[in-house]
Amino acid sequence: MGAGAGGLSLRGARLSPEERANSSKSRAIDRALSKDHTDDLNRFKILLLGTAESGKSTIFRQMRVLHLDGYAKEDALEYLSIIHSNCMEALTQLVEACSAFGILHDITVQEDVDRFEGFKKKLRDPEGLVIPVVIGRCMDRVWQSSSMQMCYETRRFRFALLDSAKFMDNIVRLTEDNYVPTIQDIVHCRISTTGINEIAFNHKKMDFKMVDVGGQRSERRKWIHCFDNVDMILFIVSMSDYDQLDPEDHKYNRMKQSYEIFKTIVHCDLFRHASIVLFLNKYDVFVEKLKTSPLRRSFKSYDGDNSEESARDFIKKLFRRCITDRHKFFVFETTATDTGNIDLVFGSAVAHIVNENLRSAGLHE
């Protein structure tokens, strides 16, 4: 009987060029995945959390500005329609506020308001919104009018328009034909985070990985997937929310809702080894709002005066009560749109954590 009938054929052990290439590619992928896993373990991992509109995604963008190459022209242009949408939303809110409070416009201003409203009705694709130059000029005239300025100055806190004022002041520039968003335009724009965004960067010879997840209630269930091996929780609270209702549930105060989420996070067993950093954000707006909206109106347990220091300390203590290990908790006042402020505060937070870790290991006095 021939060898081919009962013996071992070597024909199947030979690989085609395509198979060899695929095998080589597979091994390369395995090595890359292994390297990524090792690199990930060696990085200082930060989980960025907070409720919607707290400013956490602004801080995420600041990390790109501070520690990477910022935004190339092509990347910056992706924010154009977002910035234009912010402008449309801001003026729409102001027009509605004028109507709600019975503030009347001059005839010429009302004509521009009607022109603006007509443009909105004709919009086919809000996602790719680009405001034409002529409408930008029209919006500027409405914004600069005495009736609109009076509405803004007296009702701005009701409509949370402080961030948008920067855009409205620059609406002519923002709607020029050759407009390319600047770094500050990108930092100031408002956009809801959906899903999970990651950024890796180096800061003072340390490798970091920051993960930003959506702040809306529907996005919070995704946080659990980011919990593995977290070194630091960076939780963002909007200080200016102390007198605002939660847009997702009007029964709740926004800051109290943020407090409840913070309490849940810090008591989660998955974070028992993580440092907790709290950014009390929009601090500049908070200071301004206190002049017309006392903290006591929203927090009945507050018995201090209406000074910035007393109100700030009350909120700090409120959140600090959730913490059991005080050595791993750090709190800072921030203004997310101020690049210099975020650079300084982030550096301080990291330095505090590193020093505390060294002290815990007996390597630092």
Swiss-Prot record:
| Region feature (G5 motif) | 334-339
Question: Which keywords annotate this record?
Answer: GTP-binding, Lipoprotein, Magnesium, Metal-binding, Myristate, Nucleotide-binding, Transducer
- Which residue ranges are recorded for the region named G2 motif? 185-193
Domain G-alpha: start-end pairs: 42-364
Cited PROSITE patterns: G_ALPHA
Give the residue ranges for region: G1 motif.
45-58
GO cellular component, as recorded: cytoplasm; heterotrimeric G-protein complex
SMART domains, alphabetically?
G_alpha
InterPro entries noted in UniProt: Gprotein_alpha_su (IPR001019), GproteinA_insert (IPR011025), P-loop_NTPase (IPR027417)
Residue numbers binding Mg(2+)? 57, 193
Q: Does the keyword Transferase apply?
A: no
What GO MF annotations does this protein's record show?
G protein-coupled receptor binding; G-protein beta/gamma-subunit complex binding; GTP binding; GTPase activity; metal ion binding
- For the region G4 motif, give the residue spans: 277-284
Lipid linkage positions (N-myristoyl glycine): 2
In this chain, GTP is annotated as bound at 50-57, 187-193, 212-216, 281-284, 336
Query: Region (G3 motif) spans which residues?
Result: 208-217
GO BP of this protein: adenylate cyclase-modulating G protein-coupled receptor signaling pathway
Family according to the record: Belongs to the G-alpha family.
Please state what the protein is called: Guanine nucleotide-binding protein alpha-6 subunit
Species this chain originates from: Caenorhabditis briggsae
Its lineage reads: Eukaryota, Metazoa, Ecdysozoa, Nematoda, Chromadorea
Gene that produces this protein: gpa-6
